[in-house]
């Protein structure tokens, strides 16, 4: 009889924990849907000790996502690492952790996770792209170039890979190559303001300030409310010793930042 009573009490405890977990998890999902990520992360952390073996993995993954969305990148890496201990080699998680490592400037760790993905999927363009970006930020431009070129071979329309290669050329001071490639990309996407800013920056570095201003003009026409474009424009006017226009651009940038909370 005593054993039966113990079993019944244990069963009630288990059912109670399961109900508590399910209640908390539903609340987490609601908070994520409402984009209340900071609160969601707190509730996921409360739910985690109550999660059974099967539920622990999805709880950790969602916790990591919520942490990323609140800028708690180190904690997100820890959560992804714990999830990967449950499912080693999970491609999606390796990719997310690689992205987090990239944000933390832990480039070798990002490359390591990308290599883990490519051991399973050699032509995974997303992993190749993150790896190439990590190499570029490390200053290993030849390896970065190889990665970007391979992505472009796999996905000829991949703009991020093309822009990565433009940046490699710029870092290596291969300005003519950088200008030629960004020119082709602009022909393909003439309504993308970021592309004109990229070309403007190359021209600025070459000392071609008037040309850089023209490209800055194009970017502002396409996105007139972006304060960063006016900040860059102020720098160009300063290079041309036009302090009046530079100050006007800085004031415009400040006003837009206040208006849109950039």
Language-model regions: role of each:
Residues 33-34, 66-70, 103-104, 133, ...:
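Register position in tetratricopeptide repeats
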Residues 21-22, 54-58, 91-92, 125-126, ...:
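Helix-start (N-cap) detector for alpha-helical repeat units in TPR-like alpha-solenoids
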Residues 16-63, 69-71, 81, 261:
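N-terminal leader/linker segments that initiate helical-solenoid repeat arrays
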Residues 50-52, 86, 120-121, 154, ...:
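Structural marker of alpha-solenoid helical repeat scaffolds
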Residues 47, 82-83, 116-117, 150-151, ...:
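Canonical positions in the second alpha-helix
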């Amino acid at each position: 009889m005593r054993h039966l009573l113990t079993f019944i009490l244990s069963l009630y405890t288990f059912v109670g924990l399961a109900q508590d977990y399910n209640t908390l998890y539903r609340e987490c999902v609601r908070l994520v849907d409402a984009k209340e990520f900071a609160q969601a992360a707190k509730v996921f952390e409360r739910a985690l000790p109550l999660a059974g073996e099967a539920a622990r993995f999805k709880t950790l993954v969602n916790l990591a996502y919520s942490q990323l969305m609140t800028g708690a990148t180190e904690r997100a890496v820890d959560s992804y690492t714990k999830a990967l201990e449950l499912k080693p080699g999970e491609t999606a998680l390796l990719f997310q952790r690689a992205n987090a490592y990239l944000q933390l400037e832990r480039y070798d760790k990002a490359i390591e996770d990308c290599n883990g993905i490519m051991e399973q999927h050699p032509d995974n363009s997303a992993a190749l792209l993150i790896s190439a970006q990590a190499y570029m930020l490390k200053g290993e431009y030849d390896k970065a170039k190889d990665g970007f070129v391979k992505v472009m071979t796999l996905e000829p329309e991949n703009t991020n890979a093309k822009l990565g290669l433009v940046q490699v050329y710029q870092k290596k001071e291969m300005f003519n190559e950088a200008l030629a490639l960004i020119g082709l990309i602009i022909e393909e996407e003439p309504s993308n303001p970021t592309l004109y800013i990229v070309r403007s920056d190359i021209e600025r570095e070459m000392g071609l300030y008037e040309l850089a201003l023209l490209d800055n003009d194009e970017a502002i026409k396409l996105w007139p409310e972006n304060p960063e474009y006016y900040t860059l424009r102020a720098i160009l006017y300063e290079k041309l010793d036009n302090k009046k226009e530079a100050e006007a651009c800085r004031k415009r940038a400040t006003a837009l930042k206040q208006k849109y909370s950039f």
